[in-house]
Amino acid sequence: KKKKKSENGFWYYYNTKVADSLTTPKFGDTLIYNYSIKDINKTVIYSKADLKQQTYIMDKQELFTGLREGLKLMRSGETVTFLFPSQKAYGYYGDENKIGTNVPLICEVTLLDIKTTEPY
């Protein structure tokens, strides 16, 4: 698969890509997605079942930097695999559970839906 380098310092490739005519998320949109986290050897740290379906309001909630930036590149229905260096993931402190200090991560993310914030 052809990897792309983001302007934000991580690599990614599309597992499933949809038409470019669909929009990417904007500030305040609600995203529904699921994802898994693996280490650099592709050993699963957290599966999609472990992490369950996620809801995130774009740029209004805490999320590790790489995932926040990665979601901005995605369209509804896409699955993308990201390779995040540790500073874009959990950095020096890890997640204080299964992710240790300075661990680069592979995240496979499926963006299920984007609910746009309609102006009133």
Regions found by a protein language model. Give the residues of each.
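Cross-family detector of peptidyl-prolyl cis-trans isomerase
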Residues: 1-120
